[in-house]
Amino acid sequence: MSRVEAAAAEVKVRQHNALYLLSALCMVFMTLVVAIQPLFLRNVLNISFETAGAVNANVQVVTEVLDLFIFAYLGYLSDRIGRVRIIVAGFLVAAIGAVIAPLSPWIGGASIGALVVYYVSRVIMSAGSGAVWPQLSALAGDFSDDDTRARLMSNTAFMMAFGVTLVYAVLMQIPAHAGIAVTMLLTAAVSLAGAWLAGKFLVDVAPRTQETSVPWRAVWSLVKAEPRLRLAFASSLFARSDMVFVGLFLMLWFIYFADLIKVGQAEAAARAGILIGLMGAVVMLSIPVWRSFIEHFGRIQAVLLGMVLSALGFIMLGFIINPFDWFIVLPILLIASGQAGCFVAPQILTVDYAPRDLLGSVLGAFNVIGCIGIIFFVQVGGFLFDYVGPPAPFVFTGVGNLIISAYALRLLKREARDGGGDDAPGDDGVA
């Protein structure tokens, strides 16, 4: 290898490592914001148990509605001007919202005003983070080819899972020692670090699109023509909401059940954090297994198995009354092991069939579908949490996962009957 080739290889490794680290930082930010929210609303803004599910769900839905509008456009814009500038700007915007959030009681004054300010801060944070993580996924696709895609995107997913694990296993212990405000301000520091790292080490490598507006028609034609892409989009509709469900409603369940058994709020949050941290660790550790599974058996098979495992775990949660009972570990482990496959395989399928100059736009549409799923499932879940009971949202989303499992099985049977395989197309096939 010549000196020039060695230098180029070193730069490539540095870019990949920066992508992995940024994936972790982005998930630390996004997860910590959601995890600290029930604790902040309960102990700082004094939101009552009776309205907890609706208020927490509404905050999440407001942010997802915003994401719904920005994902598609920013995906297209990244195809036009590059992804790195959008990532840097997104981290900076997220940092602004992260500074405002803990100050909402002082900025807003009365309880209703403080809640409005907090809503605004969450919208700002969502706009920022919504500009970051889809572009990181697109960069992982840009940096890969058919031979390296499963490995590179699995490594990126591994680091995202590591970020989630770090939040619930370590960072969610901070409120009990340093306070809620300090923990919330930590998200601003994480965002600023991400902006610096992205600007310093990431580069754009994808070709620029010549489209002058969001190419909805081209994306729709792709999805309509390719059944596997339809499965990927359908999986996004259900699977993206799953992780939000666990992060939001499980934390809610612990915090508000704590009042019934006379356990402190911070202790309950820490207990839930440990459990969700365990889930994140299982997701993280199982991703290499899923990468091997995808390489040996195929993307569709991974979606099918992942959805079945997650569905079993979610439905089992419906039989639990006390979340502090350690039996809850079993369904959480099933959800975690299934979610790792559901997180990686649909994204790989999407990148497989997206033209290189429209990858950002196709992933933008993929994420829009995920937002619709989150809005629907979180809104319904908040209603079920308040009026049916804390386990109800989990059973509801488990049924949704079973529906996608049935669709994936049908697709596999049809491909087996028609003699189709599960190989990814070459770049020429999607250009």
Curated annotation (Swiss-Prot):
For this protein, the record's SUPFAM superfamilies field holds:
MFS general substrate transporter (SSF103473)
Gene3D superfamilies named in the record: MFS general substrate transporter like domains (1.20.1250.20)
Can the keyword Transport be found in this entry's annotation? Answer: yes
Please give the PROSITE patterns that the UniProt record associates with this protein: MFS (PS50850)
GO cellular component terms attached to this protein's record: magnetosome membrane
KO phenotype (gene knockout): No visible phenotype, magnetic response is slightly reduced and magnetosome membrane formation is wild-type. Deletion of genes mamH to mamV (amb0961 to amb0978) gives cells with no magnetosomes and no magnetic response.
Q: How is this protein positioned relative to the membrane?
A: Multi-pass membrane protein
Cite the GO molecular-function annotations of the record: transmembrane transporter activity
The record's Gene Ontology biological-process terms are: iron ion transport
Q: In its UniProt entry, what is this protein called?
A: Magnetosome protein MamH
